[in-house]
Amino acid sequence: MSNRSITLLQRVDNATEQLNSKFTDIVNSAKVSSKDKSALAMETYLVEESTSAMVRSLEDLLFVTRSLKEAWILGQIRPVVNKPEDGGEGQLADELLDKIEDTSDGVDKETA
């Protein structure tokens, strides 16, 4: 696997772990019990901090998907669809790429 793939997978793992732990923190702090105003204020702050961390994690996941889309569009990665070793025909990805290349060649000829 390439370094880029490993980095993207690590980012996904870190972001999902962060989302899970922060959501757990929010749920745990939402337990109903009689609390004074200072305890409620502290819990409110912790919930706001946890939601901010969740938003950052989601933005990181969006960055990963955007990077994958850009790499695919620029031809840096090939889609793996229906692998032969999995019992599939393995032709679908190649057919899709051929159609995309034919379409882009036709557009290039029309604009030239």
Curated annotation (Swiss-Prot):
- Cite the Gene3D superfamilies for this sequence: Mediator of RNA polymerase II transcription subunit 22
Instruction: Return the GO cellular component terms, semicolon-separated.
Output: mediator complex
Which segments does the entry list as coiled coil? none
Which InterPro entries does the entry mention?
Med22
Task: Provide this UniProt record's keywords sorted from A to Z.
Answer: Activator, Nucleus, Transcription, Transcription regulation
Pfam families in the record: Med22
Bias type Basic and acidic residues, positions: 96-112
Location(s) in or outside the cell: Nucleus
Which molecular function terms from Gene Ontology are attached?
transcription coregulator activity
Show the stretches that span the lipid bilayer: none
Q: Where is this region: Disordered?
A: 83-112
Q: Mind listing the GO biological process terms from this record?
A: regulation of transcription by RNA polymerase II
Assembly and partners? Component of the Mediator complex.
Q: Give the family per the record.
A: Belongs to the Mediator complex subunit 22 family.
Name of the protein: Mediator of RNA polymerase II transcription subunit 22
Q: Which organism is it from?
A: Yarrowia lipolytica (strain CLIB 122 / E 150)
Q: Identify the taxonomic lineage of the organism of origin.
A: Eukaryota, Fungi, Dikarya, Ascomycota, Saccharomycotina
